[in-house]
Amino acid sequence: MTLETGQVVALIGPNGAGKTTLLRIISGLWVPTQAQRLEVLGADLLKPLPRKKSKQWSQQLGFASNSSQLFGLLTVRENLEYVCRLYGVHKAQRAERINRSMELCNVADRSGDQVWTLSTGLKQRVNIARAMVTNPKLIFLDEPTSGLDPLAANDVYGVIRRLQNSGVTVLLSTHIMTEVNDLCDRVLFLSKGRIMADASPEQLRMRAGEVVYQLQVPTSQKQSVITRLNDELGARTVIRQDDGVEVDVLAFGLSNSNLLDQMGLTYTRRDAQLADTFWLLGGAE
């Protein structure tokens, strides 16, 4: 996988697809059970690295998970100072690195506050500042806005844009399609441990076609309806929900609604969205 400098790349896919596992493996936090080579930023992580080279490699890569990696009783600045020491950042460079990271993440005015006193949104921005303090070329963000309200999430989006503008490459995992549309240059769709698609957000959306039909089908008719759509029209269908009484079905590739009308089905017709491609790649029948 090659990522361009300054790209923001989304890693999306169903729960259990392997997104967090992939991020933790290529960041060196986990060791794969089956691999003969794992080269990231020029270093094979399956081979022991000399201590000096290991420190240098670690400084090139940042990782911020959706769970806090911070020490609550330390101040924001003290948390970043700790990371500088841990990763061997030269003492003469620490103050500049810390100040730059806090400015990028818009937390400089809270540098003296203990982390436990901060809101969830602020903690996440400090978490990203922590990952940035070694001045990495590449940063991994694992669901960076999980659990945040829209205003706090928007603050994190501002941080990601500033990282991109400063030349940092960002790989983020997310379930939020608006994040993918608004922030990302490229999308990787992961399913069952494999990359199933690699495209821009718009190119990926186009896989769902121009129009999607959303059907409400009685559960007793589910199989016959899907069979007719697939066999007679070559449609692709995805079952979104089945409550035992009625099934919510997405139908892709229909040129018109004639057959739906003939079958007396209840449906809505709308323009395809990126989320529809997610359903198509992650749950096609």
Regions found by a protein language model. Give the residues of each.
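C-terminal coupling/interaction segments
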Residues: 248-285
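Conserved ABC ATPase "signature" region
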Residues: 81, 85, 92-110
